[in-house]
Amino acid sequence: SNTTLRATGVTSSNCAMRAIAGLSLLLLAGCDKATEPGFAEAPEVSRHTVAYLKSLCDGRSSAAVTQDITIRGFITANDLYGEFDRTIVVEDPSGGIAIAAGHPLLADDYPFGAVATVRCNGLTLCNYGGKIELGSEPGDYGAEAIPREELSRYIRVTLPEEGERHRAAPLTFGEVSARHIDTRVRFDGVRFADAGKTWCDTDPETGRTVATERTIVDAGGNEFTVRSAATCAYATEPLP
């Protein structure tokens, strides 16, 4: 029988998805340089995995990070195409985490594919609907954003080392689990069941696009739900 799973992420831009054979999903001017807070190097012993960092918030609504904990991973999502407003996602082999960042143009300074080193001491982990996020403090809707003028104190962006590259993990629908939240995965040989529709529906009263769920189907007839943000730049474009 068909299996329906629900995705919590939003789709990546469909600009390069005219063929539906492969589909990628994701399961985030300062002050004067003389006064801008700088990124302090952390000892190697402070390096931990994303999974370890998130485990500090297990069973809790929030947890302040008071240890010297540093994570390092690829930036696999940002606000490019309107998908993750004021959010970047950092992913390492153990998992991914969304970081709330008070910057209106994150994609410029925190581009997809770059490497982010994040010093977490002084930040806060928040559990919002079962999803662990990192930010400045707890808020009503998850982690509050790290102020723009403080981002350079906590996050350093560098180019990948030679031969270092992020690759989306190829999965089947049945292999998706909680550990894949905020990670970039790939489904091969799938198609949209909603042919002819746009990525997002439009509210007939306001004329505005709304967050919309669409269904993809694999060769075995299994289904997976893909949710697209109302703010995405391709909301009114047809599904591939």
Give residue ranges: language-model regions:
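Bacterial N-terminal signal peptides that target proteins for export
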Residues: 4-20
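Hydrophobic helical h-region of N-terminal Sec-dependent signal peptides
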Residues: 21-25
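C-terminal motif of bacterial Sec signal peptides marking the signal peptidase cleavage site
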Residues: 28-30
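OB-fold nucleic-acid-binding modules
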Residues: 32-240
